[in-house]
Amino acid sequence: MMKLENKLHRVLCSLHQNSISTHKTYVAVAAQDEYVRMGKVSLPRMYAVKPRIQKNFQDNYRFYGTLLCICWLYFFIWYPFALLALMVGVFLSFVMHGLGSLTINQNIRLDPKYSIPGVCAVTLIVIMFLAPVGRLFWSFCIVSSFAGLHCLLTTYENPAGIL
């Protein structure tokens, strides 16, 4: 009896135009003009898209990692000193994380919560000086846009109906 009830509920919810189906959950949302009136146009769709994006990243993480490595290799073959600066920055971040909180004087305290982002920022600034900014951001744009589009366009339960 419960299976029949679930199937009927699923069919009725899928026929309703204001419902969004996630993996096994059906979420009823207000009509679009209600959200426009409230100023929340994109809210009802984001929590429905999130499980799908997460599943696509989990399924295709090798693909995204390979794409990222290819773009970085392309970038660092042409600008090896930028790779050296990145390696030094990553090494310094690991050292700062390994040392933890350091107190040099009573007034000077190095907390990893603040020092590691500082090391990362200095590393990125050095990389930008060693390599043309256009090339660096071209690699970032290729990876992020391709991975994001692939993750959104992959056909796995399109619950939000945005594509």
Swiss-Prot record:
GO terms for molecular function: small GTPase binding. It is a multi-pass membrane protein. The keyword Membrane applies. One of its GO terms (cellular component) is membrane. Keywords: Meiosis, Membrane, Transmembrane, Transmembrane helix. Its main location: membrane. It is found in: Membrane. It comes from the Eukaryota. One of its GO terms (biological process) is meiotic cell cycle. The chain crosses the membrane at residues 61-78, 82-104, 114-134, 136-156. Has a role in meiosis. This is Meiotically up-regulated gene 109 protein.
